[in-house]
């Protein structure tokens, strides 16, 4: 299976690097500057499960300009860009989509599915989620900061197809956890509930989970935000499973936790955030079903003010 990984940042670099190190046929579609960096230094991953070095001479790299000049198609496109970069990413990898190409998006939220369906056709797009806390340093090295490193994927119509089994076989044994999910849409909603909750909690109160839990009213506020997000999912026909919701709630209300969500980390760095895709879209779907979420709305308003400030 020929795999095209879009970008070689924290998430794409981690999973693409793991796949390449395991001998899979992986090509990275990257910007010219990142290509130069990788050709010089290779791709290095620091991980609690053991560090990985993909030597520069073994890396297969393409730029968007090279792909447009000489189009070639791939069996699987692994897409893990930030949601706000989706439109430009689709334009970049469009020449790589052939009649049998599968696009596996590992983006946050759900709105990206509509955009991918419109551009390439729903038959090319499957559902996917990932749980990983990773970052990339100034030298382009990827750092995985917890033991989470899983990819879950599946068709959106609950059918286990031959192409899903082929993807499972390709990714299994590459150094991260792989799960072929039957009810993929439900799994995506489940992640969205907890991702939006954790992002809203940390960004609204500007602290790690542990710092929020230590503040007066922090636990109660966090639980109220989780309840709002779960209510929106339930109203849209995707009530979170009780066990999964309980586990997720424990994770984002853990006393002493050093967890900082990616959105909060981006906010602290003065970088762009995925507020529209993670919080705004969830609020819109809640409003359409008559569900009010005042704390989630406050978090979204705060992030909207922040986003406007970094543009000015």
What are these regions (language model features)?
Residues 1-51:
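NAD(P)+-binding Rossmann beta1-loop-alpha1 motif at the extreme N-terminus of oxidoreductases
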Residues 17, 21, 91-95, 118, ...:
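Short, well-ordered alpha-helices that flank and scaffold nucleotide-derived cofactor binding pockets
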Residues 43-61, 195:
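N-terminal glycine-rich dinucleotide-binding loop that anchors FAD/FMN and/or NAD(P) in oxidoreductases
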Residues 95-96, 118-126, 139-242:
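Internal alpha-helical scaffold of NAD(P)-dependent oxidoreductase catalytic cores
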């Amino acid at each position: 299976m020929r795999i095209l990984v879009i970008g070689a940042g924290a998430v794409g670099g981690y999973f693409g690097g793991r796949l390449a190190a395991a001998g899979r046929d992986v090509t990275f579609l990257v910007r010219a500057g990142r290509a130069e960096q990788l050709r010089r230094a290779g791709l290095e991953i620091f991980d609690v499960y053991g560090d990985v070095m993909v030597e520069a001479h073994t890396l297969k790299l393409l730029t968007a300009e090279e792909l447009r000049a000489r189009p070639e198609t791939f069996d699987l496109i692994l897409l893990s860009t930030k949601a706000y970069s989706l439109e430009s990413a689709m334009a970049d990898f469009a020449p790589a989509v052939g009649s049998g190409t599968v696009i596996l998006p590992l983006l946050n939220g759900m709105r990206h599915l509509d955009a991918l369906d419109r551009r390439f056709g729903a038959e090319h797009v499957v559902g996917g989620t990932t749980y990983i806390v990773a970052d990339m340093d100034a030298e382009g090295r990827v750092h995985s900061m917890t033991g989470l490193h899983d990819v879950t994927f599946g068709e959106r119509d609950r059918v286990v197809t031959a192409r899903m089994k082929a993807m499972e076989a390709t990714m299994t044994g590459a150094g991260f956890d792989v799960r072929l999910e039957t009810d993929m849409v439900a799994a995506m909603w489940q992640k969205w509930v907890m991702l939006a909750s954790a992002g809203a909690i940390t960004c609204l109160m500007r602290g790690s989970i542990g710092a929020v839990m230590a503040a007066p009213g922090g636990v109660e506020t966090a639980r109220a935000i989780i309840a709002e997000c779960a209510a929106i999912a339930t109203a849209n026909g995707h009530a979170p499973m009780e066990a999964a919701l309980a586990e997720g709630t424990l994770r984002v209300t853990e006393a002493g936790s050093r967890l900082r969500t990616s959105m909060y980390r981006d906010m602290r760095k003065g970088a762009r955030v995925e507020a529209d895709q993670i919080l705004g879209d969830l609020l819109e779907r809640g409003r359409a079903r008559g569900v009010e979420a005042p704390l989630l709305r406050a978090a979204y308003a705060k992030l909207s003010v922040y986003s406007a400030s970094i543009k000015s």
